[in-house]
Curated annotation (Swiss-Prot):
Protein's recorded name: Small ribosomal subunit protein uS17
Sample GO molecular function, one term: rRNA binding
Entry's family note: Belongs to the universal ribosomal protein uS17 family.
Signal peptide: none
UniProt key word RNA-binding: yes
Stated role: One of the primary rRNA binding proteins, it binds specifically to the 5'-end of 16S ribosomal RNA.
InterPro entries linked to this entry: NA-bd_OB-fold (IPR012340), Ribosomal_uS17 (IPR000266), Ribosomal_uS17_bact/chlr (IPR019984), Ribosomal_uS17_CS (IPR019979)
Listed PROSITE patterns: RIBOSOMAL_S17 (PS00056)
Superkingdom assignment: Bacteria
GO terms under biological process: translation
HAMAP family in UniProt: Ribosomal_uS17_B
Length: 82
């Protein structure tokens, strides 16, 4: 089974080798048919502390690295477009 990949924005980089990434998702409410935005925070591994708050990044599933970290940052949006 392939690893999931998500795109989000770094909201915190205060921890060593860890960033908190907010991932937004949109869906239509089943009854009211209104588009709803929901977000979730993921703790992701950042080995070199290279990502700062406000960066748009891609994260990929990985083995559990700590109590909360199950994701790893692979690249930023700037690297992907360059």
């Amino acid at each position: 089974m392939p690893k999931r990949t998500l795109q989000g924005v770094v909201v915190s980089d205060k921890q060593d080798k860890t960033v908190v990434v907010r991932v937004d998702r949109r869906f239509t409410h089943p009854i009211y048919k209104k588009t709803i935005r929901r977000s979730k925070n993921y703790h992701a591994h950042d080995e070199n502390n290279e990502f700062k708050a406000g960066d748009t990044v891609w994260i990929v599933e990985s083995k559990p690295l700590s109590k909360l970290k199950r994701w790893t940052v692979v690249q930023s949006e700037k690297e992907k477009t360059a």
